[in-house]
Amino acid sequence: MQTTVPSSVLDIYRMLPEGTRCEVLYNQLSMSPSPSTEHQLISFKLSGLLFVFLEKSNKGIAFAAPTDVYFEVEQSVVQPDLLVILDENKAIIQKDGIYGAPDVIFEILSANRKHDTLKKKTLYEKAGVKEYFIIDPSDNSVAMFAFNGSKQYEMIYEEKGRILSDILGCDLNF
């Protein structure tokens, strides 16, 4: 019997069983535990709000974790908590995942805060994600990062329980 030896971290990732909570960040595998109940509640509420908004506005489509997002930049595959792809960018949606930068990404902080606030923020910035929202489930605070005319993310606002998106043109309270 002939076996295939993986030649990259991405090959190893693709061999993992479906549903494995794992990402490839900067060509390194990163496992994560199941999210907290607070995390899940926020994700559920926000995904419902986004779904209703996008259905009414016909602007795009939302996906929830676990949806693989493949970035050529930094050889990374991530599973954001929520993401939105506008209609004009739907070509990046493939059967097995998203290949390229979603227009908007939402990450709900977990125990490993550095993962979302530093590593993923840097990756999303390099990949060209237009808006990045970081939600802290401990107090429902939302920090929104965008390019704002520059090549680097700037914090646009920080507020509790409110999503203001210029890209989507929405104001959602959760």
List PLM regions with ranges.
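Gly/Pro/Ser/Thr-rich low-complexity, intrinsically disordered segments predominantly at protein N-termini
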Residues: M1-F174
